Design a protein with these regions (language model features):
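C-terminal helical cap/extension that packs against the catalytic core
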Residues: 3-28, 113-115, 154-208
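Nucleotide phosphate-binding/pyrophosphate-handling subdomain across enzymes
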Residues: 53, 57-165
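Short, acidic/turn-prone active-site loops that include or flank metal/cofactor-
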Residues: 32-34, 120, 145-149, 170-177
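Short glycine-/acidic-enriched loop or helix-start segments at secondary-structure transitions
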Residues: 14-16, 39, 125-126, 153-155, ...
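Alpha-helix capping/helix-boundary segments
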Residues: 214-215
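Acidic, Mg2+-coordinating active-site environments of NTP-dependent enzymes
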Residues: 1-60, 74, 78-90
Length: 224
């Protein structure tokens, strides 16, 4: 199976090459000659403008995805299919509405609302806030943060407080933490994994979890 990437950093390209060599997959690193601009974001998805700089073609499209990262990934798919496989953009319009890409801003359930986003940097957390505020008010929601690097915890916690979340918890997983979280979180804001599980299952209001790709299978498949 061929692998396509727009990796510009040498360290990323080298890592991909090694992995593809191990799996015997051909790797194609392409120049990013496309742009994606979000025109409108609603609870049902995003209307965006896709521009192929290589062909000059541009088209307004809709995706049920709410995270800008996933919309850019859809732009990558469009560019590859249109440029490398000569599939007309118009033929892909309807199919785009069906594309679901797991891993970013996943709505696990709507009633009660459960959202998971493995954002772990201030920039990605900012994107999470933009998406989340479209479907729910932070003031009505509980936010759970876990597995963030120490230097980023205070920044993201501050951003979460400014966003006005009803309650913000740090989920304490000792096996993966680097230091005692009580050094930067009040003890009553720290939850054990067991108490987090109870909160996730029993809380009737809206709840969002952010912090790490490592726990994606646990959250999205409810394995906790």
């Amino acid at each position: 199976m061929p692998v396509f990437s727009f990796a510009q950093k040498k360290i990323v390209a080298d890592m991909l090459k090694k992995k593809c060599d191990d799996l015997h997959c051909p790797l194609f690193i392409e120049k990013r000659d496309f742009a994606v601009d979000v025109l409108e974001k609603t609870p049902s998805g995003q209307r965006f403008l896709y521009v192929n700089h290589k062909t000059g073609e541009r088209m307004e499209l809709f995706t049920p995805e709410l995270n800008i990262v996933q919309t850019r990934n859809i732009g990558l798919v469009l560019f590859i299919l249109e440029t490398l496989f000569s599939i007309p953009l118009e033929k892909m319009r309807k199919e785009i509405k069906k594309i679901y890409i797991p891993g970013r801003f996943e709505i696990i359930s709507k009633k009660p609302l459960r959202v998971f986003d493995p954002c772990h940097t201030p920039e990605s957390f900012k994107n999470f806030l933009k998406s989340f505020s479209v479907i729910e008010k932070p003031s009505k929601s509980v936010l759970c943060i876990f597995l963030l690097k120490d230097k980023k915890i205070k920044t993201i916690f501050s951003m979460a407080k400014d966003a006005g979340f009803k309650k913000i918890y740090w989920i304490d997983l000792p096996v993966l933490r680097k230091k005692d979280p009580s050094s930067f979180f009040c003890k009553d804001l720290i939850l054990s994994s067991e108490n987090f599980s109870k909160l996730w299952k029993n809380y009737k209001g809206s709840l969002a979890c952010v912090g790490s790709f490592y726990l994606a299978p646990l959250i999205t498949l409810k394995r906790f």
